[in-house]
């Protein structure tokens, strides 16, 4: 997917969602069956024919696994994607554990890159809201279609 299908300026949302599901399945392989984290991904609306920038949603799911699930499989991730003819809504909510990166290196780089990419690709036709507390982290992304 990353090498061949996502090389253009846009990709069918159905393929992007399929890639997200594959990524989630891959991440869950590292946990034993008795310590699987709670991961809930629901996609509603019409996915086929809806074009988005490739890999624009993946960094949020990557961050949810990185910061929302500890090594024992404790934590949760809730992902919702909904499309209408006018808008894509993408919501990720996850538990939050203390920063694993004690040195502070690379902190927030991925998120800053996504912000820049959204600004470049969607200008003022998107909104990204981030809500962070001690125990939970949420992003609410809306992109005009």
Show which residues each predicted segment covers.
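C-terminal coupling/interaction segments
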Residues: 143-145
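Two-component histidine phosphotransfer core
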Residues: 1-131, 136-140
